[in-house]
Amino acid sequence: MKIMATGVFDILHPGHIHYLSESKKLGDYLIVIIATDKTAGSHGKKLIFNEEQRRFMVSQLRMVDEAIIGHEDDIFKTVYEVRPDIITLGYDQHFNDSEIEKKCRDLGLNTRVVRISKYDGEIKSSSDIRRRIIELYNR
């Protein structure tokens, strides 16, 4: 079963590892789609690493079978090319699960969307890391 996880993955942290590990448990092949610099920037993200560096880092994680950079213009172009059985979304990804499933059906895909639970640890996002660094250096 092919699982597709998506994200920016700029500053890798335990929340990312939780998301990808839980995604991998759902199937035998995990492909991770990395948001392009342009796509991430259009959502207000200020990136530390460029898309190729982010793809490389994610590709080195044990649970990841493949990491690719997504398409800028149409996210469903990547979905159609990958043809996943399941698309996993993180707790903080603002997509409508049923709309994604409907769009997949329109493309002739029988893809399910699964939300992955929030990581319980203290640092669970890149924003948490940025805040922590600022706190440490402003003491």
From Swiss-Prot:
Homodimer. PANTHER family: FAD SYNTHASE. The lineage of its organism: Archaea, Methanobacteriati, Thermoplasmatota, Thermoplasmata, Thermoplasmatales. ATP binds at V8, F9, H13, P14, G15, H16, D92, Y119. Keywords: ATP-binding, FAD, Flavoprotein, FMN, Nucleotide-binding, Nucleotidyltransferase, Transferase. Belongs to the archaeal FAD synthase family. Pathway: Cofactor biosynthesis; FAD biosynthesis; FAD from FMN: step 1/1. Its EC number is 2.7.7.2. This is FAD synthase.
